[in-house]
Structure formats: structure tokens, C-alpha cells
Amino acid sequence: FGENTAYNAASTSGTIFNAATGSYRMDELNVGDFCQFRFDFNLTPQFANTTVEVGLIWATRDASNNVTFTFALTGEPLFYGAGTTGQTFLNRPVTTAYLASDEDVNARALPAIRADQPVFIQPLTTLFTVGR
């Protein structure tokens, strides 16, 4: 899904997220659905002792499509210690979300990766699974 709106330049915690072409929308789902998002990507740390967070920038929206809340949904951090510099690792972290309200069903979710040191990312694919 591609949407060219202010959401694609969303910011949270003082960090501006760019290169945001595409997001997930849940408007064909139902309150009570359980969603799993798996991101497959290769990551090459440029320095040892690098911590990487993978998740979604989640923006709930009201019935008029106004963003009501924006926050990050993250999973366990990935850590690359000594001896990992310059090596490429396949990652498949999973982030989950429970659609608890109509605002969640009308939400947009933008995949995001943040690292505390420079890394190379090669995106591969995503898998979005809905449990009812």
C-alpha cells in the first residue's frame, strides 16, 4: 500500500522517519483481530556492539482519517557483538498487534528499523498474517 500523505513523513520521539514509501492499512480487518508482521532483511553491522530495533510506527486514526496517536511497536532488540563487523546476517523479527478498537482498524503501520550505529540494510520481504 502506498500513500503519499503527511503520515509518510511521520515523526516520533524526535526522530524523523524518511524513505517511507508504503505502509500497511488495516481497514479491511475487524476489532479483535490479531496481526503478525514479519520483516525479512539482511543486515551488515559496520561496528561491533550495535543494537538494532525493528518494529512498526503505528498511527491510529479516527473515522475522519485524522491521526489520533502515533507510537512505535517494537519487539526484542537485535544485538551484534564482537566479531560481527562486516558480516551479513539474515533477520526475520516478528512484531504483533491486537486490533482493540475502531481506531486500530483504521490505523496505518509503517515498517521501521533503527540502529545505534551505522548498518547496511537489504530489505527482502514482509509477511502480514491475520488471526481471527
What are these regions (language model features)?
Residues 1-132:
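Extracellular jelly-roll beta-sandwich "head" domains, especially the C-terminal globular C1q domain
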